[in-house]
Regions:
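Extracellular and analogous surface-interaction loops
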Residues: 90-98
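Beta-strand-rich binding/interaction modules
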Residues: 97-117
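C-terminal beta-rich recognition modules with glycine/proline-rich loops and embedded aromatic residues
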Residues: 1-91, 126, 135, 146-275
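Solvent-exposed segments in extracellular or luminal domains encompassing
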Residues: 132-138
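Short strand-turn-strand beta-turns centered on an Asx-Gly dipeptide
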Residues: 116-124, 172
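A short beta-strand motif that forms part of the nucleic acid-binding face
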Residues: 106-108, 119, 137, 149
């Protein structure tokens, strides 16, 4: 995991932390840092792919591309704020070629997405597939797709016992986490209330990110003082409702040290609530 400054690295990427992990400038055995740089340099070549008479859009990012097809070239101009916004527009500029296919990747996490050509409905892209738009193109044709990037909770397979009663927060393709810097109560003691998530753009935070906010129960664990185990139901915890803030997981550990957690507790257990 690379820092936002681009010069500090993790060799492991924990999904929960008590505030002890800090990125390092270098390692005695440092194969991962240069591989990160290599991957970043390679990403532009992963955005598009081509066949003899088809162009595949694999990744969504504001970009321009010139693609050689049988019979001519096509230039593509992609406009989007993805992953913060699910709207993607691709302007097509054919040069010497008229009929070919433009295939859009529909992410597996998304709901079915409406596809439009020049403002008119063309079809619906099903998650986990490529949606084909084949036609005779003209200069300035625009294909538009809107993917549902709204915040959601994701659960693990029941055999992943350490995540029982927990969920991860997702916004579009990004996994989120709760970091202490954004939350008043200990993030390890927060139980997120399902159905309360909302997204909020913060241009002043971590280089500009969408945060996910919602309601949580802040658990008072003081009744467990001096106990590691107790008969089921004997210890009664109190809780109060608070607001939590989650940030993209890639952006954690770029501020002061503090606890972090990605798989958050869900507010479904029986606890008393206090004002």
């Amino acid at each position: 995991g690379i820092s936002l400054s681009g010069d500090l690295y993790f060799y492991v990427n924990p999904l929960a932390d008590r505030g002890r992990h800090r990125r390092q400038r270098w390692f005695e055995c440092a194969c991962c840092p240069p591989n990160i740089a290599r991957l970043i340099a390679y990403v532009p070549g992963m955005v598009y792919a081509r066949g003899r008479s088809s162009v595949y859009v694999n990744l969504y990012a504001a970009s321009r591309a010139a693609v050689e097809l049988d019979g001519g070239r096509v230039q593509l101009v992609q406009r989007t704020r993805y992953p913060w916004d699910g709207l993607v527009e691709i302007e097509v500029r054919p040069e010497g070629v008229e009929e070919f296919s433009l295939l859009l990747r529909a992410p597996g996490w998304s709901k079915p997405a409406r596809i439009e050509v020049n403002g008119e409905g063309f079809g619906t892209a099903q998650p986990g597939t490529y949606f084909e738009v084949r036609r005779k193109w003209k200069e300035g044709d625009v294909v538009r797709a809107r993917f549902d990037v709204g915040p959601a909770l994701v659960e693990a397979h029941p055999h992943v016992t350490c995540n029982t009663g927990r969920a991860a927060i997702r916004y579009g393709p990004l996994v989120y986490c709760l970091e202490q810097a954004d939350n008043e109560h200990n993030v390890w003691d927060l139980a997120v209330v399902p159905g309360t998530l909302r997204a909020e753009w913060r241009s002043d935070l971590l280089g500009g990110v969408v945060t996910v906010k919602g309601k949580a129960l802040a658990l008072d664990t003081s009744a467990w003082a001096g106990k590691l185990y107790a008969p089921l139901g004997e210890v009664q915890m109190q809780a109060r409702e608070v607001e939590f803030t989650a940030i993209p997981y890639y952006a954690w550990a770029n501020r002061e040290l503090g606890p972090m957690i990605a798989w958050v507790r869900l507010a479904e257990q029986k606890v008393g609530q206090s004002a």
